[in-house]
Amino acid sequence: MPLIEQYDVVVVGAGHAGCEAAMAAARMGLRTALFTLNLDLIAQMSCNPAVGGIAKGHLVREVDALGGIMGELADAVGIQFRLLNTSRGPAVWSPRAQCDKQQYRVKMREVLESQPNLYIKQAEAVDVVVEDARVTGIRLRDGRTIRAGATVITTGTFLNGLIHCGEERIPAGRSGEPPSVLLGESLKQLGLRGCRLKTGTPPRLDGRTIDWARFEEQPGDADPTPFSFRTKTLPMRQISCHIAYTTPETLRLIRENVHRSPMYSGQIEAIGPRYCPSIEDKVVKFPDKDRHQFFLEPEGLNTHEVYVNGMSTSLPMEVQYEIVRSIPGLENAEMLRPGYAIEYDAIDPTELDRSLRVKKFEGLYLAGQINGTSGYEEAACQGIMAGINAALSVRDDAPFTLNRTEAYTGILIDDLISKGTNEPYRMFTSRAEFRLHLRIDNADRRLTPYGRRLGLIHDEAWADYEAKQARAVTLEKLLATRKIKDVTPLAPALAQAGITDAASLAGQTYAQLLKRPEMSIEALWTVIRAEVAEGEAASLFAPWFTNAEEASQPLPAFVRNELKSVETEIKYAGYLDQQRKSMEKLKKAETRVIPEWFDYASVSGLSREMQEKLVRVRPQTIGQASRIPGVTPAALSLINVYIEIQGKRLAKGGHPVQV
């Protein structure tokens, strides 16, 4: 008799999506099992040992604000922190951290193993169990059946994975690990539409064989910005990365051997990530460029392994050696691991609804690269959403979704389920219609109340959140109401900002002064400090002065971040109000639900092509339908009218379609 185990939620795959999914479900009180092919490689950073980056840092902040774990882990093992895009406006500032690859994996396992309700298992899932259009669990290669109220699949690049290095082809989920073939076939048998995608990774070098003096040093920020709102200190020693460039000899070697690249020989037919091209792709597509930049990034404090960011390649190993050694400073470099490309199966994300549930089956959720995305951060935000909704479904509660006005996470999911993707999807700030509202500094204000309601934010974190919001409200009110009586104390700040009309400031509020583009809130710190340190709200602001008794001491990072958030709300108030009006219009479209029974074929005036697209995606709202490529405003108006027509027929006891 086969062995059967029972859980509330089962998660397949312990990468960045799977870990977030399992933690979310367990923290919500559900008995959760997390299955992985190798317990020692949980949360493995298969590619770049870094978290965050432009737009990706926004996703990490959102995961953290909801109660996820990626941000805190990156802070705990980060060895270089940089805040990117600071030359532009605060809407697009984004944190990035180089991480200790080994410590990230170790720390993640510690966190998972210490979580009540969570059981981590090493085994291979080979089949999805389906009963009456409901997924009821999985089967393992060892014969066990794992029954669960909800199943989350987060297999990354493992579904029918195939590695390419030159002419060599190796079935693998990633280097050194077997692919998941049987589970891939099981998902195909469910009738889900799929595609074949490709990604790649660069060679790793031995840092002891690099002449570091030949490269430009790239240090981290002197005062690092953490990912997590809950992080108090950054414990790891900080180190530098280095900037390098290809040479004419590098380009010659690539051009002469490009026919041996699987991408150009026809060996790989899958589509790779547009915004993370291989080095051979760069050389072919940008023939006029005489050099390409790349970065030498240490993989940790206790290893000599160096990641060559910007040199992803699947050229033969001997060619990779020549390419590396064509660069001054790398003439004697030893390659620890070659770069490679990997093809894998993905599911068409238009098969999913907004909760990341597969529409055709109850109880089945997908997250991460299986949905056509690229990147740890894109995976993590899907993982926490899938885990939350898997838990809610077991409780028979309504799903939790985020829309495009609330979070980059909502934008990512909406893009996937509305438009699908034929290449690995990467998040950018340009994908957001309202990015001034979706900043890194206000991710907690946007999402932490949701996390608290769901049971993902513990009491101490919630108390810190409430205190922070109270400080922001108090400070905004103070700056908006307190008028400048004497400009003398402001003289240094005004001089630094280049403001010469000091006399005209008398009678203005500090908020009016702060609206000037050249004025920063930190320049007003002396005035603010005097107001909040001894005023009625002194106890509320006490955390600001714990480590800064003297006014001359540098501001702690969290104080600076809170001040900057208040400054942004004041300085961009007019633009924020304009965006709120546009957001309300979008929200109205999102509340207009398209019923599941709606028949597009009966809508007179819809072209066959448009009908096919709408039937394929099955949008849940008019707003989602509007974002399907090719669906026109006229078509949306028709759908709106026919929802009423078909609804009235149904209400009279008939069929929604006139027959």
UniProtKB/Swiss-Prot annotation:
NAD-binding protein involved in the addition of a carboxymethylaminomethyl (cmnm) group at the wobble position (U34) of certain tRNAs, forming tRNA-cmnm(5)s(2)U34. One of its GO terms (biological process) is tRNA wobble uridine modification. HAMAP family: MnmG_GidA. NAD(+) binds at residues 272-286. PROSITE patterns: GIDA_1, GIDA_2. This is tRNA uridine 5-carboxymethylaminomethyl modification enzyme MnmG. The keyword Glycoprotein does not apply. It comes from Acidobacterium capsulatum (strain ATCC 51196 / DSM 11244 / BCRC 80197 / JCM 7670 / NBRC 15755 / NCIMB 13165 / 161). FAD binds at G13, A14, G15, H16, A17, G18. Belongs to the MnmG family. Its main location: cytoplasm. The gene is mnmG.
